[in-house]
Amino acid sequence: MAQAQYAGTGRRKNAVARVRLVPGTGKITVNKKDVEEYIPHADLRLIINQPFAVTSTEGSYDVFVNVVGGGYGGQSGAIRHGIARALLQVDPDFRDSLKRAGLLTRDARMVERKKPGLKKARKASQFSKR
């Protein structure tokens, strides 16, 4: 019989992560690289592990991620969102704890667009009264 696989899709800023959970030892692979190799910042790796900490399932699943778009921060948030959604398929009882931790909510904050006549989205040149 084939091993159980659980899938979830996560999004954050411009990043989209397709996540697969397979029962295993807790190894996380992002775009065919180890997570320590792919994401250099330890605090971002902690963000990725949050859903496992909330549901007390650390080391129970191997995670395979395909992520595109955005930078390290956006990709980490997308992976976290995808893992949380995949854990819901593992056990629907996780919904309450994941929802309370805010891990199932898609963070809708996006980069504000640059406006014409301004240097950035809100930065204008210095105002001179006279």
Curated annotation (Swiss-Prot):
UniProt xrefs under InterPro entries? Ribosomal_Su5_D2-typ_SF, Ribosomal_uS9, Ribosomal_uS9_bac/plastid, Ribosomal_uS9_CS, Ribsml_uS5_D2-typ_fold_subgr
Q: Which Pfam families match?
A: Ribosomal_S9
Q: What one GO molecular function would you report for this record?
A: RNA binding
Q: Report the coiled-coil segments.
A: none
The answer on whether this UniProt entry bears the keyword Ribosomal protein reads: yes
Origin superkingdom: Bacteria
Keyword annotations from UniProtKB, A to Z: Ribonucleoprotein, Ribosomal protein
Q: Name one GO cellular component term.
A: cytosolic small ribosomal subunit
Q: Which GO terms describe its biological process?
A: translation
Which PROSITE patterns does this entry report, sorted A to Z?
RIBOSOMAL_S9
Family, per entry: Belongs to the universal ribosomal protein uS9 family.
Q: By its UniProt entry, which HAMAP family does this protein fall under?
A: Ribosomal_uS9_B
| Name used for this protein in its record | Small ribosomal subunit protein uS9
* Native source organism of the sequence: Streptococcus pyogenes serotype M1
